[in-house]
Amino acid sequence: MDAGLAVEPAASEAVRNIQCSAAADLDPQALIDPAPQARALDQRLISDDRFRALPPKFRFVFNGGGLTHLADADGDIRADAVSTPEGPRYRIGLAGTSATAHSLGNCKPSQVVDVLVELALIFLEERQRLITPARRMRQLIDACGSSPFAGLRDLSRPGGVMADHPPAPEPGRTRAGTVLGVALGCLGTN
């Protein structure tokens, strides 16, 4: 816990399922570095006891785009960086990948944490209305559609262009010198 890898109480640890584009701050093709928003969401989730009711494996995805994109990562609630005439925004989606999620609209990066928190609270409220509470966003949408999530105040109409996300290199097709294989824990300054 001193290293920041876990939190007290243990029940809060279960809600910390946030996937964020790795090294987006170093990626020249990324539209947004989502790490600050992911850290802020993490703090909101662990500081509010209501989120301990989120089911295990309920996942939030922050996709900044670029080389370290998470366009193909499946998430319950996702924020994908898009380029708009007004500047970079997050496209908010439910239950899926960038291509398959139910798109709700766009929001400013400064609003994304509040929007995702509100969506998670709506999920927690709506799942209890089912005979068997939904464990994933897909189950809730299949049961009652995405209408409970419509009309959030901080969302504008969906639009914009996602950052290019090149496919991962195929094994054996990578130029020599572009990949470094190092055993876990062996890369250091000594």
Name these PLM-found stretches:
Residues 51-55, 122-144, 154-170:
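Flexible, glycine/charged-enriched surface loops at secondary-structure junctions
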Residues 151-163, 183, 187-190:
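Rossmann-like S-adenosyl-L-methionine
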Residues 97, 137-142, 183-187:
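Active-site beta-loop-alpha junctions enriched in small/polar residues
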Residues 1-93, 105-107, 114, 118, ...:
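Small-residue-enriched alpha-helical segments and adjacent helix-cap loops
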Residues 25-29, 67, 99-103, 127-138:
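Noncatalytic linker/hinge segments flanking ATPase motor cores
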